Amino acid sequence: MAEMILRLRIESKSFSTDRGELPVLGRIDIALGAREIVALVGPSGCGKTTLLRIVGNLDTDFQGALDWCGAAMPRIGTVFQEPRLLPWRTVRQNLLLAQRTEDPELADALLRALDLAAFSDAFPSTLSLGMARRVAIARAFTIDPQLLLLDEPFVSLDPAMAARSRELLLNAWRARPTAALLVTHDRAEAAELADRILLLGERPTQVLQEIIVPQVRRPDLMP
């Protein structure tokens, strides 16, 4: 594994309901390297998105610890299932507004990498779902993230569009490699994108199996 950037140890995580506490996560121990893509694969409702929210510091109500390995919390780029683009801004403006300091050259490079250059002046309402998702991926990269959180970014896309979007995501990642946690139901998708896969069980969720993806499938990870 590359230099580790985070270690997440969860003892338990529950949600409060009218009927009492609902256990969601059991004992989980996840480590992530600086240039590593780790996929979280499991059934609906098993807490995959909750894990991402904990790593993204959006949910701090759990028993356990999130350790950034001696460093400050990194810059995190997040891609949700819904693109959440600003509808009154163009594609390019959505990227520029996300940046800490406007960097038009980086924005344009990402639009090219994700096959969106021809749509830089388009508004989100004119885009297909697949294109809007790619804009969201470009926006996540535009902050120069040290960690990407990808919450089923290709769900509901037709197979051809999903395959093309995965290819373009890897193109962008190879140009700016960073750590990433990917949530997906699709084991084939996980094997294409990740170099480790964590198979999650039913609630209260634990890691059932860790699968190392052969480097021949991910030559970009080879030294």
Spell out what each predicted region is:
Residues V41-P43:
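The feature captures the beta-strand-to-loop junction immediately N-terminal to the Walker
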Residues G56:
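Helix-to-loop junction immediately C-terminal to a conserved catalytic motif
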Residues F123-L127, M131:
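Conserved ABC ATPase signature
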Residues L148-E152:
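Catalytic Walker B motif of ABC-type/P-loop ATPase nucleotide-binding domains
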